[in-house]
């Protein structure tokens, strides 16, 4: 089966680099599915889970807190603001971040504080959703 080169990079490090049969991730206007030979595309991505279907049946999961996606016919590059390997996701930390963001929303003093708190809440909620999705998938295997 045909594959596509996939790189997921955060500001701190390269999170994933390898060949994949399929990539799914949260695009700005909805879920995107990328197969080898996909039409070139550049778009923003929302916080959420990136699923990379590699040969051999194992999927790699990476949580991204937004960023940019570039698709070329033979390559997919995800430039993430923040990226965390699926195995390194921590539900307790994500829940704590959600609570902090909700508390901050109750005490906003400016539009900038409001926007920052809303962004932090959206990221924490997306991370918790990604953890739940990953847990469901792992329970099937």
UniProtKB/Swiss-Prot annotation:
GO terms for cellular component: plasma membrane; proton-transporting ATP synthase complex. CDD domains: F1-ATPase_delta (cd12152). GO terms for molecular function: ATP binding; proton-transporting ATP synthase activity, rotational mechanism. Belongs to the ATPase epsilon chain family. F-type ATPases have 2 components, CF(1) - the catalytic core - and CF(0) - the membrane proton channel. CF(1) has five subunits: alpha(3), beta(3), gamma(1), delta(1), epsilon(1). CF(0) has three main subunits: a, b and c. This is ATP synthase epsilon chain. It is found in: Cell inner membrane. Keywords: ATP synthesis, Cell inner membrane, Cell membrane, CF(1), Hydrogen ion transport, Ion transport, Membrane, Transport. Produces ATP from ADP in the presence of a proton gradient across the membrane. NCBIfam families: ATP_synt_epsi, PRK00571.1-4. It is a peripheral membrane protein. The lineage of its organism: Bacteria, Pseudomonadati, Pseudomonadota, Betaproteobacteria, Burkholderiales. Signal peptide: none annotated.
């Amino acid at each position: 089966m045909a594959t596509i080169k996939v790189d997921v990079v955060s500001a701190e490090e390269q999170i994933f680099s390898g060949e994949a049969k399929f990539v799914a991730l949260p695009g700005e206007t909805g879920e995107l599915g990328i197969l080898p030979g996909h039409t070139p595309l550049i778009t923003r991505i929302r916080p959420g889970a990136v699923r990379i279907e590699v040969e051999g049946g194992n999927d790699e999961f990476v949580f991204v807190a937004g960023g940019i996606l570039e698709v070329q016919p033979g390559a997919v590059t995800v430039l993430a603001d923040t990226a965390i390997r699926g195995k390194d996701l921590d539900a307790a930390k994500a829940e704590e971040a959600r609570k902090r963001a909700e508390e901050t929303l109750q005490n906003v003093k400016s539009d900038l504080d409001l926007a920052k708190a809303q962004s932090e809440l959206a990221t924490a909620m997306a991370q918790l959703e990604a953890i739940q999705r990953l847990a469901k998938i792992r329970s099937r295997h």
